[in-house]
Amino acid sequence: MKYNRVIPGVFLKRPNRFIAHVCINGKEEVCHVKNTGRCKELLVPGCTVYCAVSDNPNRKTKFDLIAVEKKVENHEGDADQNTTASDDKNALLANHKNEFETDTVLLINMDSQAPNAAVKEWLASGASPFGQIDLLKPECSHGNSRFDFYLECNKRKIFIEVKGVTLEDDGVVLFPDAPTERGVKHVHELIQCHGEGYETYILFVVQMERARYFTPNRKTHPEFADALYEAKQAGVELLAYMCTVSPDEMKLDKPLKIKL
């Protein structure tokens, strides 16, 4: 999936989960954050972010914050890891070059709507493991459940639930980044659908280009990790895919190993 106009900026602060203050072209702008999650490990004052320009003149905010460069620690000399970020905008901008531009960075798309859009393109293109699809229905209801995708191909009937992954720790990517009762509910509903004869998949879309493997975040939400293991045992298929990511585009790329 592709964005029309994207420009870089320097993240300053996030007063609430909906907006962030970003320095764009030397001016402090209020941007809509397209991810209501905590994202504290991503939105570090002074980091480089990327914002899509909105074409809607009636919006309160002109920009959508969609991607961020995360500094990847090399574990050699951790002395500057504990540097306290100043609340002063000028200090943040002055530190930006020294702290971020000289380190290895990982570009992460943090738009919570991007995974479903990218998966829809991937499925429709015929490049997925499902091949050519006869019927593709996003946001499909089934009983009391609602799944991200329903598809039919070669007489197969398939439900897919998509989860976007932005949390990375030393090359390991994890989901969720916060407790998700809704996520547990989705897993149990897929187990039920599998029992009814449908093929069922949970697809973790890793919104970055580099990772060693995916694993459920048991420390943050053990119930989700347990539900995922139960689903695997019941026959629900688990998939994880890395993406190619640029400031203005994200596409599904290579499968990634899963460790439960």
Specify the residue positions occupied by each region the protein language model found.
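Short, charged beta-turn/beta-strand-edge "cap" motif at the junction between a beta-strand
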Residues: 13, 53-58
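Nucleic-acid nuclease catalytic cores
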Residues: 164, 171-181, 188-220, 242
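Domain-level recognition of nuclease-like catalytic cores that cleave nucleotide substrates
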Residues: 207-260
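Short nucleic-acid-contacting surface segments enriched for D/E, G, S/T with interspersed K/R
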Residues: 37-50
